[in-house]
């Protein structure tokens, strides 16, 4: 296995232009495929998850043209359902942002299609989405294990009243919302349990609106969507920078700034993970906002105790930032860390202990007490891009850190370690 040892960083300073958001990129690609007209997507993320979606569009005979650097994509929309040939098998890696929305989208047709992925994808639950799609008439079979991919989809979703459990993943609701306008009947979606990651639903609703479709949202409990609608291409769509990816650079500035300015997101961003900057501010950093940037300056950091259900991906960065804060930090209401690319609660607790932290891992929370001195460790990354990027922050101590399988950042940010190095100053 490859490894990368990061030497201690004495100071972080400069400007970073963010790659496009994974969440926005894959939603925009699918809506562009549904839409009437050609859509030019700019600042598209080039990463593994996006490539899986693009490969799926190719297999589904949706024409698109990609720029040489893969950040501009012109998609010729289908003016409705995307069906694909019967007997097609789509391999979607470990890309939840492709698997869940495509599962719903392909239920609108009547062809038989198999959706599968990497071994970890087969451990990520999809039963709540399948249950909801079946309530709307969809015919779906589990090929291996009940409630998990791979799926055998036979179409049949026609809308109606459906109930979906919102407590595990907001992607299930996102998938239903994006497919529902193309169903033959109106759809009424009722949410069971507490809806996690609400800001990701706001991203979905905002994107649908950009493509000409509105949804009645009754306090995130009931959603009403008219059937037989048509998505309309906005012509051009700029994908904002990835706010989750911004978290590492902002946290680095809070710990060892200098000042870091992150461009591509700003005070009016769609993404809930921009609220990560507010958490850093509560911990003691100085934050400044612009229309298309956020800036962080070093402060004396103190631990916090906070519900971070709304920003689950960026909350991981707080767990490693806690190593540099005074007092303990508790991150609460994050059960859905357990059903991401790996069991992130267990992974973060295990690796934080390696560098010397005292950690309590609960069912849906993590408590971190920083060590007096951070220890050098080899960090297992569990093929999880965010674990790798979170633990790069350990290099902001006086101790090196070794990241195993650093290439796993290709899922969302292939160039991450180079970008971090550009902002880093080292004591010689």
From Swiss-Prot:
Pathway: Metabolic intermediate biosynthesis; chorismate biosynthesis; chorismate from D-erythrose 4-phosphate and phosphoenolpyruvate: step 6/7. It catalyses: 3-phosphoshikimate + phosphoenolpyruvate = 5-O-(1-carboxyvinyl)-3-phosphoshikimate + phosphate. Coiled coil: none annotated. 3-phosphoshikimate binds at residues 22-23, 27, 169-171, 197, 313, 336, 340. Its main location: cytoplasm. The active site is at residue 313. GO terms for biological process: amino acid biosynthetic process; aromatic amino acid family biosynthetic process; chorismate biosynthetic process. Its EC number is 2.5.1.19. SUPFAM superfamilies: EPT/RTPC-like (SSF55205). GO terms for cellular component: cytoplasm. It is found in: Cytoplasm. Phosphoenolpyruvate binds at residues 22, 96, 124, 171, 344, 386, 411. It is an enzyme of class 2 (transferase). Monomer. NCBIfam families: aroA. Belongs to the EPSP synthase family. This is 3-phosphoshikimate 1-carboxyvinyltransferase. The lineage of its organism: Bacteria, Pseudomonadati, Pseudomonadota, Gammaproteobacteria, Enterobacterales. The gene is aroA.
């Amino acid at each position: 296995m490859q490894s990368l040892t990061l030497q201690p960083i004495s100071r972080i300073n400069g400007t970073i232009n963010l790659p496009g958001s994974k969440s926005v990129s894959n939603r925009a690609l699918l809506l562009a495929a549904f839409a009437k007209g050609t859509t030019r997507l700019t600042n598209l993320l080039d990463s593994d998850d996006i490539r899986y979606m693009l490969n799926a569009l190719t297999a589904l005979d949706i024409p698109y043209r990609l720029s040489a650097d893969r950040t501009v994509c012109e998609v010729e929309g289908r003016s409705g359902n995307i069906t694909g040939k019967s007997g097609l098998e789509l391999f979607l890696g470990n890309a939840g942002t492709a698997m869940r929305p495509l599962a719903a989208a392909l239920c609108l047709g009547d062809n038989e299609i198999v959706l599968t992925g990497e071994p970890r994808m087969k451990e990520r639950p999809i039963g709540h989405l399948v249950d909801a799609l079946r309530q709307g008439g969809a015919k779906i079979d589990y090929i291996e294990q009940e409630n998990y991919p791979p799926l055998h989809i036979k179409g049949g979703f026609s809308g109606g009243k459906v109930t979906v459990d919102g407590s595990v993943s907001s992607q299930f609701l996102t998938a239903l919302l994006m497919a529902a306008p193309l169903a033959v009947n109106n759809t009424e979606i009722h949410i069971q349990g507490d809806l996690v990651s609400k800001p990701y639903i706001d991203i979905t609703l905002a994107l649908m609106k950009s493509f000409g479709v509105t949804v009645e949202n009754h306090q995130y409990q009931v959603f009403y969507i008219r059937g037989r609608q048509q998505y309309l291409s906005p012509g051009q769509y700029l994908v904002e920078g990835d706010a989750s990816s911004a978290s590492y650079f902002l946290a680095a500035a809070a710990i060892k700034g200098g000042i870091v300015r992150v461009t591509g997101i700003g005070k009016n961003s769609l993404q809930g993970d921009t609220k990560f900057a507010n958490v850093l501010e509560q911990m003691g950093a100085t934050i400044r906002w612009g229309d298309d940037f956020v800036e962080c300056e070093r402060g004396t950091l103190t631990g916090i105790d906070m519900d971070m259900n709304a920003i689950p991906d960026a909350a991981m960065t707080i767990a490693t930032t806690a190593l540099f804060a005074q007092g303990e930090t508790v991150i609460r209401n994050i059960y859905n860390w357990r059903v991401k690319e790996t069991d992130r609660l267990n992974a973060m607790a295990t690796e934080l202990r390696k560098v010397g932290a005292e950690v309590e891992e609960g069912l849906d929370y993590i408590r971190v007490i920083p060590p007096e001195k951070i220890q050098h460790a080899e960090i297992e990354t569990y093929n999880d891009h965010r674990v790798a990027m979170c633990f790069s922050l350990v290099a902001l101590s006086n101790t090196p850190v070794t990241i195993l399988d650093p290439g796993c950042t290709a899922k969302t940010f292939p160039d991450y370690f180079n970008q971090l190095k550009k902002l880093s100053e080292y004591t010689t």
